[in-house]
Curated annotation (Swiss-Prot):
GO cellular component, one term: plasma membrane-derived thylakoid membrane
Gene induction: Transcription moderately up-regulated in the absence of photosystem I (PSI), probably a monocistronic operon. Expressed at very low levels during growth under normal light (40 umol photons/m(2)/s), induced under high light (500 umol photons/m(2)/s for 6 hours) with maximal expression by 3 hours and no change for 24 hours, after growth at 4 degrees Celsius for 6 hours and less induced after nitrogen or sulfur deprivation (at protein level). Upon return to normal light protein expression is stable for 3 hours, then decreases.
Organism: Synechocystis sp. (strain ATCC 27184 / PCC 6803 / Kazusa)
Keyword Thylakoid on entry: yes
Protein's membrane topology: Single-pass membrane protein
Family: Belongs to the Hlip family.
Primary localization: membrane
UniProt subunit comment: Forms heterodimers with both HliA and HliB; these are associated with photosystem II (PSII) assembly intermediates containing CP47 (psbB). In the absence of CP47 (psbB) and HliD, forms a homooligomer in vivo that binds 2 chlorophyll a and 1 beta-carotenoid per monomer. Cofractionates in an approximately 50 kDa fraction the thylakoid membrane with HliD. Associated in vivo with monomeric PSII.
Subcellular location(s) of the protein: Cellular thylakoid membrane
Protein name: High light-inducible protein HliC
Residue ranges that the UniProt entry lists as topological domain Cytoplasmic: 1-14
Length: 47
């Protein structure tokens, strides 16, 4: 990961943002489940 000329976008900057957005999504899903009493799929009517 030290190669800043990577062709696939695996840079420290991209990985930091990916981790941050993943935690926001996970936290949002957890809060939604706690507030509504339903899972995410049930909340949106998928299951």
């Amino acid at each position: 990961m030290n190669n800043e000329n990577s062709k696939f976008g695996f840079t420290a900057f991209a990985e930091n943002w990916n981790g941050r957005l993943a935690m926001i999504g996970f936290s949002s899903a957890l809060i939604l489940e706690l507030v509504s009493g339903q899972g995410v799929l049930h909340f949106f009517g998928i299951l």
